[in-house]
């Protein structure tokens, strides 16, 4: 198709899309018009003013079909708004003012009649229905009106899944809901609230056993109504992962006409609640969650009421009335103690104007110097920069700023970046100190909250946590946010209360210290971070901060509980997550960044407190192999009066814990993104409080002074920021905080000058981001290049242990077994490439030796003197020459000299004949396809023991890292096997199934004491325990039978290998007699079977095996079951003196090696 045709096709598609959108909009308009007409008819039929009464304000009279109309409206809400994700019905009901003109009058009339009838009934003792005719019908109308009010006042929230219709109606409906709230709070002083409470009390007066689910739902509906009234506010409520920066809506744009902020503020809500006894109703419901009401119905709506009632209040202000003064150039001082919200905003604007006026006066010359000024600067290129301004005569920096302002820059193309907002400001007030509340309301709300905490907080939190953990489906993000911020606020409230009130105690919020609580919110924090659900992450950080602050504020009587809780919530995985939060906070909103910095400060303060005596132990993130000695468990159980299983669980838990080291935890925060987050936060220093600035400065001191990571702060943006902070327009000159910044800046510049003298290249480095190349980074830190040719850390080769009757086996049979063990172990660990590299080098050496045979003996002897270096094709193989113990032992068996401290090279020793080299090659190739099999089902690693010269406990918390990053995973096995398919690794499939977790098979180290060594060996050789439920008669037989059986299997495998996997009928018959005779005679032989084992083998691997070494008689038969297993650990000194020693004699083992307990002894 030609190009014009493509253009026409695109234009046609665009036209069709525009037409479809237009048709869809027309359809939506028609749909809304139809719905609006139906709602209008229902609104007319509900009722209206009774004009038959001669009165200026006629009473409201319900229509004949009032109840049916209300039910129809409820059905419309569910049919359209709920099921179709539209707000057409809500918009239509708002335009007809159904709530103000119909629902509120209905509830007020019902409340007045019901109250009067109740008083008369109490006086006369007669039934209330006598004084309130047709009461049940009117009760149903009132109940329907309240249900419809709940639907109309339900908080509107925009999420990523909101439809176009909902976004289009959002701001208009928000204004209508603000009108609803104003009408509810002000109509007859909020008597609608009393009517709603009366509906709930009528149900609560019925005995719990006689209530129905409908009755409990009514109580929940009343709580939802109270929650909606408190939650309606002019702020935009959005829960979105990404929100673009835009011009914020002013307060005038968000508010409807003739409504002020004070009319719907929290102060007005508290006034209405106090007058209509809402606080008493909430305390009644909260304190009777397990008695008078069903917690499954009311616990969550009650928690939401408390959350929205307190989220905009600063808890500290309830106990310490902070009076911020505003200097407006007058003789008197204005404070915010008795100032409305509007007056507060006006005072702030006047204060800013006064400050700017003083700044202008300070930077303007006097009338005697207003005669002009001229400054001309000659550049090295013989050009001149001239400035004519009065400001150049006052300060040098003013002249430079004038020059910069006159520069002509090329217009750069900037991309519009998404700024992640995190938690909406509607969920936590950023102006908590400036919200107006009268002194009477402060007293009322403080008394109510204190009573709630003393009587109901722990009970409500426990029920809410149980409901969260019992539900299978995941909770909504909104519910997670409300749950975490609810705990955060009341924990902070009680912490402040304990400071200002003597009789207050932390016991009343101790429910937050329960395992279920902190496990739940740490789970929400971790999962939300992985899912990039930033609002929930933001709420989790606020809770985590207050949680740690609360724990640190507890006295010595809580020390055990604090230790237990902190050791669980600050696990290694959680510390890693907390360190990653400020890394990703650069692109987030300022409030999100503030939460990150506050959390980081509290975490570091917590760890620093416990680091003084190294008393904080946390759960390790690594899976540790627990080897507990039977004797140690029994001793611990006896000393602590415990049973065996309890003692084992306690000791096992201790194995899973590690001690926190502050320096290694802080190392996780030493990253460039984290530093950038702090610098960006400090750039708005004029808007930050003193405590926030102190926290940022303290973090920089940790980085620059304590950690000596100066390179992170040697950057041009930080230098410019320090200069701006300490300028005349920066921090106030009389501020104590300025003194701290000045001292830090002096030390900073001193270190910078020293570094610049030592490394002139730093002049270039400070202009650009850090380079993460290891060589450059090392040079910038230490001022010298890193030695690239240095010898890596050297580990000792593995030694063989647990090999039965090792001393009596023929040399070549033992060599075959040892090579099989090493090859199978390497295959299991994913080191197939190491075996391949070894075979290539052996084949190269074999070809060289084979080619010299024809040249004569002299040439061959001359060739043997030469050292053939091992050819390592990549860095992994080269590192394995130094640090892989199994591979180093296999090199020795193959005839290589392995690298040592005094001999860093690896080379082939030409002291073997071509036949011997060929034998080694074929043995390795055989075990690649036919892995080693143990008679007792043990893996190949069971027969190996690794040694380390510079041993560090692999389970120690935060092992040292070469790159300086504490939280990087150093599990070598995972790195080498990740993403690798072990196509030829058949050894694993032949063995008993093992754990798929990370291998940590360090069996023993010279630094361990003998008891630990015996415990490890004992547990590693322990046979599985047989349950009594499955004990058969065979378990009572001779234990030697199993050993003889496995020995016969070994001899059969040797025969099969010897004859290439096939035996004749005569050989099978003879071998059957051989096995039967050994079984009958307890392993002893009466006849001669040399004819069976002394035939010439067909495989070249066993071509040189002597006949006398193969003949199996009663004297040479090994006994695998009764001999104790012994091994020897060779020290680094002994190994250095004998680098080529391949085995240790049994006499040396008996002399130097402590005996390991056998299975039967255990």
UniProtKB/Swiss-Prot annotation:
The keyword tRNA processing does not apply. Residues 993-1003 have a biased composition (Basic residues). Component of the fork protection complex (FPC) consisting of TOF1 and CSM3. One of its GO terms (molecular function) is DNA binding. One of its GO terms (cellular component) is replication fork protection complex. Residues 977-1017, 1127-1162 are annotated as: Disordered. GO terms for biological process: DNA repair; DNA replication checkpoint signaling; meiotic cell cycle; replication fork arrest. The gene is TOF1. Keywords: Cell cycle, DNA damage, DNA repair, DNA replication inhibitor, Meiosis, Nucleus. This is Topoisomerase 1-associated factor 1.
